[in-house]
Amino acid sequence: MKITLKEQIKILQEDGKLPKFSNKKRDFQIVTDENIKKGSIIYIPMINDDGFVVKGNYKSSDKWIVVMGISKDDCIVGSLLVNTKPNTFFKELGDIQFPLLKKDYSFWDYKSWLDCSKLFRIPRLRILQYGGYCGCITDSDWELIWETVKNTDFISDSDKEFFGIL
């Protein structure tokens, strides 16, 4: 009898044997329902359906995201994208690029930047299937990030309400 990948993962998690998600450089814990919460940092292949523009002839691009909120029906996760360089296309956009220091996040190789200008809508099931759990934003960073996202005009109030930010 064949069982699905999701069922296999559930069995392993129930037995206390958390499998690892791996890219070429790192191993991550598989994302569990408990990991999908505000402030979680997840490594996932982003696709066009997430609202992310995949460049070149690729189907996906591996990215770090930070969970900002979850829809009321618990199906869609609102996330911000982490970049290696700040997006400073114009001043207002540069002002909402939040620095994430390597000393606070040991799994990064360098200082990174959280782009607080756009919420990406990623299905919860896709995060559970393909994501790697990395950890959480520090409490001090979270307070500043939350206020930045709550007050930015780059994200619509309806999107903020949809994900419980307002």
Where are these regions (language model features)?
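Compact nucleic-acid interaction/catalytic patches
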Residues: 52-104
